Swiss-Prot record:
It comes from Methanoculleus marisnigri (strain ATCC 35101 / DSM 1498 / JR1). Its cofactor is [4Fe-4S] cluster. InterPro entries: NifH/chlL_CS (IPR030655), NifH/frxC (IPR000392), Nitrogenase_Fe_NifH (IPR005977), P-loop_NTPase (IPR027417). This is Nitrogenase iron protein. CDD domains: NifH. It catalyses: N2 + 8 reduced [2Fe-2S]-[ferredoxin] + 16 ATP + 16 H2O = H2 + 8 oxidized [2Fe-2S]-[ferredoxin] + 2 NH4(+) + 16 ADP + 16 phosphate + 6 H(+). One of its GO terms (molecular function) is 4 iron, 4 sulfur cluster binding. PROSITE patterns: NIFH_FRXC_1, NIFH_FRXC_2, NIFH_FRXC_3. The gene is nifH. The key enzymatic reactions in nitrogen fixation are catalyzed by the nitrogenase complex, which has 2 components: the iron protein and the molybdenum-iron protein. The reversible ADP-ribosylation of Arg-98 inactivates the nitrogenase reductase and regulates nitrogenase activity. [4Fe-4S] cluster binds at residues 95, 128.
Length: 272
């Protein structure tokens, strides 16, 4: 079983990438489980054709975890992809990372963490204990950083690289960096910038996903691009990403940049 996690700044398109990746992997005949680890609980919505599935935290609050069954938390979406949403606390109360911890504990008890590939879609703005759990506890063996050429997105990716480097020193954790995915924002020189960032942290750019209107059109139809426009160039990008990720045997322990190095790096690519 291959377990991968996509981390990235909120709003970077991480969930769109994860859903299309899962859809493309399922198209190869693989059994896929996607777990949304974000309080917005929208990771699997396009796989579920717009349905907001109940979150683990909501169900625990309503029933208590002892009364929850697999069918209560695991839903089948497009191409049979199994979908789970961790959820988050009520606004202003509690810790968002707690939803992830509770989700993993419940799924383990229900023996639901299985399949050919598990895709964890994780918020990466703050890599606190809860959000780092897929890495820290050895669930996600390969981490993929989703970023654009925007400085704050690169900054978040670099912070996640720091977490990977730190956690990799612990015997229990087996996480490594599988590569960097550029979800483009149409910034001048963006591909070169992200490619160089990946190189400097000891990794590689494994996919460049161009900005395309078809992504928004598909989402308005409550579908992934892979389902809505399977013959499109954009779908082909996601299908190639799926093949690359599934066949990837080259991972690394990253060497994240210090803040002054990150700022100097950004200045190299800024057109003044």
């Amino acid at each position: 079983m291959k377990q991968i996690a996509l981390y990235g700044k909120g709003g970077i398109g991480k969930s769109t990438t994860a859903a299309n990746l899962s859809a493309a992997l399922a198209g190869e005949g693989l059994d896929i489980l996607q777990i949304g680890c974000d309080p917005k609980h929208d990771s699997t919505r396009m796989l579920m054709h717009g349905t907001w599935i109940p979150t683990v935290l909501d169900l625990i609050r309503e029933r208590g975890d002892e009364k929850i069954t697999v069918d209560d938390v695991v839903y089948r979406g497009f191409r049979g992809v199994r979908c789970v949403e961790a959820g988050g606390p009520e606004p202003g109360i509690g810790c968002a990372g707690r939803g992830i911890i509770a989700t993993f504990q419940l799924l383990e008890r229900l023996n639901a963490l299985k399949g050919d590939v598990i895709v964890y879609d994780v918020l990466g703005d703050v890599v606190c204990g809860g959000f780092a759990m897929p890495m820290r506890e050895g669930y996600a063996q390969e981490i993929y950083l989703v970023t654009s050429g925007e400085l704050m997105s690169i900054y978040a990716a670099n912070n996640i690289a720091k977490a990977i480097a730190r956690l990799s020193r612990r015997v229990r954790s087996r996480c490594t960096l599988g590569g960097v995915i550029c979800n483009a924002k149409n910034i001048e020189g963006e591909r070169e910038l992200v490619d160089e960032f990946a190189r400097r942290i000891g990794s590689r750019l494994i996919a460049y996903i161009p900005r395309s209107r078809i992504v928004q059109v598909a989402e308005l139809q409550k579908q992934t691009v892979v389902e809505y426009a399977p013959e499109s160039d954009q779908a082909a990008v996601y299908q190639e990403l799926a093949r690359t990720v599934y066949g990837n045997e080259t991972t690394s322990i990253p060497t994240p940049l210090e803040m002054d190095e990150l700022e100097s790096f950004a200045l190299e690519f800024v057109q003044v």
